[in-house]
């Protein structure tokens, strides 16, 4: 499942008429970097893209273009409109995951969940292979800088790679490992989404669910190598475009 229902107001006016995952970076839409890295993942049949009423038709058009360009793609796309029309009535990322799981009856499936504005260069084959058989696995990335980590979910892991501490946007970070928005959830974990939301927890940032979950179930980690870039502003968008254009050259 690709999360693409946000409104990216910090990137206005670029995202007034185009969803953030459809913005071009390094010669292709951000979401294509995600989808291309799914190639070869075993047993992947359907990629659900959850979006909003404003951009659903844009994602439909994009998915048709993608499949006509890349004939023989192993999976099909299903675009899900969450019905929201603005930042004021959005369901939030965790709300969207629960919405799709319920609507599409995915409660008995293992689910790979990825934020649609995640820019990373490594194939997800190894991540999925590592995650199979676990209740929950989250991708982590070493940002290499104690100042940079203050913008993200900072985690500590034990010798087995299980999360022992998770702090969102820490003032005093412990290490430089960031939890990033690439998740693998089993049916046992998907059933807890409703519990989490019913308790009035934050429905928006997907990392908040992991922060709640790790105290209840073991959450495994897998470190992503290569490049991972967070697109939160026009400046980081331009920087990402520059970096990925060079990588493709």
PLM features: residue spans?
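Conserved donor-nucleotide/metal-binding helix-loop-beta segment in metal-dependent transferases, i.e.
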Residues: 122-150
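Short, hydrophobic/glycine-enriched beta-strand segments
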Residues: 1-6, 202
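Short alpha-helical oligomerization interface
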Residues: 16-21
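Conserved N-terminal catalytic core of the sugar/cofactor nucleotidyltransferase
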Residues: 2, 10, 24, 28-113
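The conserved acidic donor/metal-binding loop of glycosyltransferases
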Residues: 116-119
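Catalytic-core segments of class I nucleotidyltransferases/pyrophosphorylases
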Residues: 128-129, 162-230, 234-249
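A structural signal for short hydrophobic beta-strand segments in well-ordered beta-sheet cores
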Residues: 22, 155-157, 221
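Short alpha-helix within the catalytic core of nucleotide-sugar-dependent glycosyltransferases
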Residues: 35-36, 60, 121-133, 190
């Amino acid at each position: 499942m690709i999360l693409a229902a946000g409104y990216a107001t910090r990137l206005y006016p670029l995202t007034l008429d185009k969803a953030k995952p459809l913005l071009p970076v390094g010669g292709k839409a951000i979401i294509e970097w995600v989808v291309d890295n799914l190639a070869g993942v075993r047993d992947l049949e359907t990629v659900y893209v959850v979006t909003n009423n404003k951009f659903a038709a844009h994602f439909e058009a994009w998915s048709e273009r993608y499949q006509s360009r890349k004939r023989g793609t192993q999976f099909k796309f299903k675009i899900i409109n969450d019905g929201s029309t603005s930042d004021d009535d959005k369901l939030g990322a965790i709300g969207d995951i629960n919405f799709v799981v319920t609507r599409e009856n995915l409660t008995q499936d293992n689910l790979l969940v990825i934020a649609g504005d995640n820019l990373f260069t490594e194939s997800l084959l190894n991540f999925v292979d590592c995650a199979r058989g676990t209740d929950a696995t989250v991708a982590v990335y070493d940002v290499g800088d104690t100042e940079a980590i203050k913008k993200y979910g900072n985690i500590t892991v034990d010798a087995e790679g299980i999360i022992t501490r998770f702090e969102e946007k820490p003032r005093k970070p412990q290490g430089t490992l960031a939890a990033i928005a690439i998740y693998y959830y089993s049916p046992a974990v998907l059933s807890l989404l409703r519990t989490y939301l019913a308790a009035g927890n934050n429905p928006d940032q997907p990392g908040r669910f992991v922060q709640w979950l790790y105290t209840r179930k073991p959450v495994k980690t897998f470190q992503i190598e290569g490049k991972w870039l967070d697109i939160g502003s026009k400046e980081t968008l331009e920087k990402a475009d520059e970096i990925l254009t060079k990588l493709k050259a």
